[in-house]
């Protein structure tokens, strides 16, 4: 489908991206860059960085609920070695900036190791489609509670972050 819409031959496409894994990694890089900028816009510069994290992860999870093709891409990205490594390394840099003040004794490497776990939580929720009991809103609350506790965010602030995201039209933001 990508080859067809791009208007190039499959051999030229392969030369550009080397392989399916190269295409996935390029796509992941593009999506990663755009999601954090969208999240920064939605969270506003006046709010603490933890809100940017919450909006960014909410966008990812919401996208997988709105589009099965995107669910497959995200799941593959969190599974395929090169793409997953890119996600974890780049996310660790963001996490260090966002959560470093909550755990000043931790290094960027420590946040990389924490990201391995939080990425697993994210992938788990992405892999399980919402249903009548596990709604998107419930998924987001559970994810924020688990991940923000791992980053040592105080309980009161976790509650404020959850209420903030619940006040957003995350589906509309995700579709932009």
Regions found by a protein language model. Name each.
Residues 76-130, 134, 138-145:
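Amphipathic alpha-helical packing segments from all-alpha helical-bundle domains
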Residues 26, 37-72, 79-80, 88-92:
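Hydrophobic alpha-helical connector segments
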Residues 1-22, 26:
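Helix-turn-helix
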Residues 71-76, 157-160:
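Short, hydrophobic secondary-structure boundary micro-motifs
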Residues 63, 67, 121, 149-154:
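Phosphate/oxyanion-binding loops and surfaces in catalytic or ligand/nucleic-acid-binding neighborhoods
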Residues 97-101, 131-176:
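C-terminal peripheral helix-coil segments that are non-catalytic and often amphipathic
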Residues 32, 36:
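Contiguous, function-dense segments enriched for cysteine-driven chemistry
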